[in-house]
């Protein structure tokens, strides 16, 4: 069963429930019109959010926190559907019944912390982290252009 909740205008939480797997997963997505002036910044946002929060200020601290959640994982989500850009975070963890504790709710709280209390300096994202993630995004885009088979697959997806 899939549950999709609109938390705020154009902000959705999607949770998939099934007994087929021993893991639980969810995604939190922002839907934005695809605009040339915003696309790169929208694509950058999830990676910057994954660089830390007020309470968990580093990648290392995030990794430690995920380890405490029985090896849960969180990743960036960037997709294009027609003229809509979908960006956000996805997460998965061991189902509570197999973990013997409430891992899912703690993971949901942690993702909320990353989203609503990001690591900032003077009321804005940390400039150094934004620059690093910008370079990472540029390198990832260049690596797709350099890999002819990957580039071909992108072309096929849009035909």
Residue ranges and their predicted role:
Residues 43-50:
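Active-site SXXK
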Residues 52-55, 96-99, 117-126:
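Short, polar/flexible loop-turn hinges at active-site or ligand-entry regions and domain interfaces
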Residues 1-25:
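N- or domain-start disorder-to-order transition segments that initiate the globular core
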Residues 63, 117-141:
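Acidic/histidine-enriched alpha-helical segments
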Residues 22-35, 40-42, 59-113, 139-142, ...:
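M16 family metallopeptidases and their MPP-like homologs
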Residues 47, 113-116:
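Short, hydrophobic/amphipathic alpha-helical patches that form generic packing surfaces
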């Amino acid at each position: 069963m899939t549950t999709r909740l609109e938390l705020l205008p154009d902000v959705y939480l999607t949770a998939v429930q099934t007994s087929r797997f021993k893991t639980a997963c969810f995604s939190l997505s922002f839907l934005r019109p695809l605009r040339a002036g915003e696309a790169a910044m929208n694509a950058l946002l999830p990676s910057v959010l994954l660089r830390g929060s007020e309470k968990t200020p580093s990648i290392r601290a995030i990794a430690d926190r995920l380890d405490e959640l029985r090896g849960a994982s969180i990743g960036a989500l960037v997709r294009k559907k027609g003229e809509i850009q979908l960006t956000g975070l996805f997460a998965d963890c061991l189902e509570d019944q197999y973990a013997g504790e409430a891992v899912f709710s703690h993971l949901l709280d942690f993702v909320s912390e990353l989203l609503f209390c990001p690591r900032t300096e003077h009321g804005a994202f940390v400039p150094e982290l934004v620059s690093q993630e910008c370079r990472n995004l540029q390198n990832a885009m260049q690596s797709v252009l350099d890999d002819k088979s990957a580039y071909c697959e992108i072309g096929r997806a849009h035909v």
